[in-house]
Amino acid sequence: MKTSEELRLAPDSLPSDLVPAPVLQASPADKNTDSEPVPPPCGGDDQLQVATDAVASSVVSQELQQGDSAPLEVEFNISSELSPRIEEQEVPENASLPVEETNRPELESGEAMEGVSEEPAAVDEGDIFWSYSFSQVPQYLSGSWSEFSTRSENFLKGCKWAPDGSCILTNSADNVLRIYNLPPELYSESEQVDYAEMVPVLRMVEGDTIYDYCWYSLMSSTQPDTSYVASSSRENPIHIWDAFTGELRASFRAYNHLDELTAAHSLCFSPDGSQLFCGFNRTVRVFSTSRPGRDCEVRTTFAKKQGQSGIISCLAFSPAQPLYACGSYGRTLGLYAWDDGSPLALLGGHQGGITHLCFHPDGNLFFSGARKDAELLCWDLRQPGHLLWSLSREVTTNQRIYFDLDPSGQFLVSGNTSGVVSVWDISGAFSDCKQLEPVMTFLPQDDCTNGVSLHPTLPLLATASGQRMFPEPTNSGDEGEPELDLPLLSLRHAHPECQLQLWWCGGGPDPSNPDEDQDEKGQGRTEAVGMS
């Protein structure tokens, strides 16, 4: 789907009465890299059990002090060599994936580790940067539902905005990754806009269950050589997909001690884009993005009955310090040095296996969530092992339930098993471990909300819903009563609502008819469960 460069935003088409946002990049799927940038759319416990390494804790305490500590310098040695598209069967030794230029200045601990161009684009004085507001229930804009109704047992497994905000990526039970552009109606100058159903512009099919997926950390739609997606699926290599064409660009292979191909359970690109970190059983493997294939660095997390055991199920990098966090299905969190993987601290406190991690933009706090665990936990890196506070959410299954932070670090948003989306205001100082209550909750649909993603530049919240439905045994009728023509196992009480939805969170006028029942397309109904 191509977006015209001639379109301009009209304040009247916004869900709010605010003025237009700054310029937004074109979607990777648009393939028109010579065009001018497209304008943006208008529109609980007293004390949890914590296990820490005394020596490691002291080390990380010295390195991760308050903001007055000496900055840590990190030098990135990145290859600028670009690669052709590489077939999965044959990967030349000299093949490489594109990364940023080598003449990049050193970054200090207080700087965000993002791509730095030689000539930064000028910022128009008239540009306005949006901020999120949850003083009222978000307004529904558009969504996609027909795409996930072709199979009776299909459901979404999360959604992730691209780093530049040009498009959104989804995962689903049919083993297909889909990329959607922003709705074209957001560029309309009409006062009354009827949003059509969103249609994916790309579909990338994996061979089996997708374990994890992620965007390239320096992805920019203006640079096609940075627009790609990584995915890992059962009994398959790690695949790199072209976000412009949907073609396979490269593969990374990991092998166990029997020289058998093994699949990664979690993926995360380093902030500078030079490395791909992958989680395995008691191991993190680090691949160089400039050299696809099987060559990698193996970092063991558990040795001699010490360390972090279990499958490394999620990974996240600190935006301000040279370290990364690993969550495992063994219910532990580990902090490791970026350069050599040396352990810094080991934390515990969750009741189930860790499924998602997220660092605060300031780099001092990070959040963790687990399966079959009713709490999100917040940790302070300046005091390793100290739990800052907890946030309650309903997670009663083994499904991965995502949460996300807005770019300013003020709001944290999470779904839950019953479908309710909760929003917490985490700004301010919290010195004691306590329960933090949400400032607002709302119900997008009557099914599990497993994915939430906050747009990096616009007040747009994306939600993904659905869960696996297990059949229930049917009761045989009493003697003399007619028996229903139903199988012994039935899904007649299940009403799945599998859909991707976009919500405007810019603090505009109240949405019309908030209590109106949802129609067959899945749009219109938003139920406020509670607000403060």
From Swiss-Prot:
Q: Which GO terms describe its molecular function?
A: histone binding; identical protein binding; protein carrier chaperone; protein-containing complex binding; protein-folding chaperone binding; RNA binding; RNA folding chaperone; telomerase RNA binding
Give TM regions.
none
- Sites bearing Phosphoserine, chain numbering: S27, S61, S83, S476
Q: Give compartment(s).
A: Nucleus, Cajal body; Chromosome, Telomere; Chromosome
Q: What cellular component GO annotations does this protein have?
A: Cajal body; chromosome, telomeric region; cytosol; site of double-strand break; telomerase holoenzyme complex
Kindly list the positions at which Phosphothreonine occurs in this protein: T474
WD repeat ranges per the UniProt record:
151-190, 206-251, 256-297, 307-348, 349-389, 395-434
Annotated region described as Disordered, given as residue ranges: 1-48, 83-115, 505-532
> Keywords for this entry?
Chaperone, Chromosome, DNA damage, DNA repair, Nucleus, Phosphoprotein, Repeat, RNA-binding, Telomere, WD repeat
Domain of life assignment = Eukaryota
What PTM annotation applies here? Phosphorylated at Ser-61 by ATM in response to DNA damage, promoting its interaction with histone H2AX and localization to sites of DNA double-strand breaks.
Q: What is its main location?
A: nucleus
One of its GO biological process terms is:
protein localization to Cajal body
According to its UniProt entry, what is the function of this protein? RNA chaperone that plays a key role in telomere maintenance and RNA localization to Cajal bodies. Specifically recognizes and binds the Cajal body box (CAB box) present in both small Cajal body RNAs (scaRNAs) and telomerase RNA template component (TERC). Essential component of the telomerase holoenzyme complex, a ribonucleoprotein complex essential for the replication of chromosome termini that elongates telomeres in most eukaryotes. In the telomerase holoenzyme complex, required to stimulate the catalytic activity of the complex.
Q: What do we know about how this protein assembles, alone or with others? A: Component of the telomerase holoenzyme complex composed of one molecule of TERT, one molecule of WRAP53/TCAB1, two molecules of H/ACA ribonucleoprotein complex subunits DKC1, NOP10, NHP2 and GAR1, and a telomerase RNA template component (TERC). The telomerase holoenzyme complex is associated with TEP1, SMG6/EST1A and POT1. Interacts with the chaperonin-containing T-complex (TRiC) complex; which mediates the folding of WRAP53/TCAB1. Interacts with COIL. Interacts with SMN1. Interacts with RNF8. Interacts with histone H2AX.
Give the family this protein belongs to, as stated in its UniProt record: Belongs to the TCAB1 family.
Could you identify this protein by its name?
Answer: Telomerase Cajal body protein 1
Q: Which organism is it from?
A: Rattus norvegicus
